[in-house]
């Protein structure tokens, strides 16, 4: 890796990515069932 990230930045990035994935899944499921 070219840039060295701190553990807190990596943790925040993982949390944001997880929330985005969960929101996308819930949205697709709700659209699929309607």
Swiss-Prot record:
The chain crosses the membrane at residues 10-32. One of its GO terms (biological process) is photosynthesis. GO terms for cellular component: photosystem I; plasma membrane-derived thylakoid membrane. The keyword Transmembrane helix applies. It is found in: Cellular thylakoid membrane. It is a single-pass membrane protein. The keyword Repeat does not apply. SUPFAM superfamilies: Subunit XII of photosystem I reaction centre, PsaM (SSF81548). NCBIfam families: PS_I_psaM (TIGR03053). This is Photosystem I reaction center subunit XII. It comes from Synechococcus sp. (strain RCC307).
